[in-house]
């Protein structure tokens, strides 16, 4: 073995790398009237997986102490959601709660929720279990959800 694979050539008969395109397949679940947002899961710089290690580091916990959801500025305004408010996401599989981060880093109709938290902040309560037929990877980047602001009365 070598520290870097394929530095001089690939391990194919002709020494070249071969790429193959695949036919586009739409996601198993798309946004609709009841669940109008597309949810993506995402990682953070400050935490690793479910925080079994990074969650105990005070400085890392201080940076991101709880789950958050990035929501587009236009969507937040339409739903009267302010930055830092608690929101609830609902899918066909469950619900989760997190802090809203209003931003233009995600497009309209798209939400990004951190994947590192458990309990009410667990994005896995929402994600679609459909598997890609080729890779067998779950569609964690494409789940239809609804969003609502959590009020004191609820």
Functional labels for PLM-detected ranges:
Residues 1-59:
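Long, low-complexity segments enriched in small/aliphatic residues
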């Amino acid at each position: 073995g070598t520290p870097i694979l394929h530095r001089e050539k690939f391990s194919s008969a002709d020494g070249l790398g071969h790429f193959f395109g695949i036919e586009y397949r739409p996601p198993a679940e798309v946004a609709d009237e009841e669940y109008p947002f597309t949810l993506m899961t995402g990682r953070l710089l400050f935490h690793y997986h479910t925080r079994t290690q990074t969650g105990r580091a005070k400085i890392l916990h201080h940076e991101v102490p709880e789950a958050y959801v990035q929501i587009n500025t236009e969507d937040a305004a339409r739903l009267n959601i302010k930055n830092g408010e608690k929101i609830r996401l609902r899918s066909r599989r469950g619900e989760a709660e997190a802090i809203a981060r209003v931003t233009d880093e995600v497009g309209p109709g798209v939400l990004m929720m951190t994947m590192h938290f458990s309990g009410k902040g667990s994005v896995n309560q929402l994600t679609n279990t459909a598997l890609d037929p080729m890779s067998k990877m779950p569609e964690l980047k494409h789940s239809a959800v609804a969003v609502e602001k959590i009020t004191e009365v609820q």
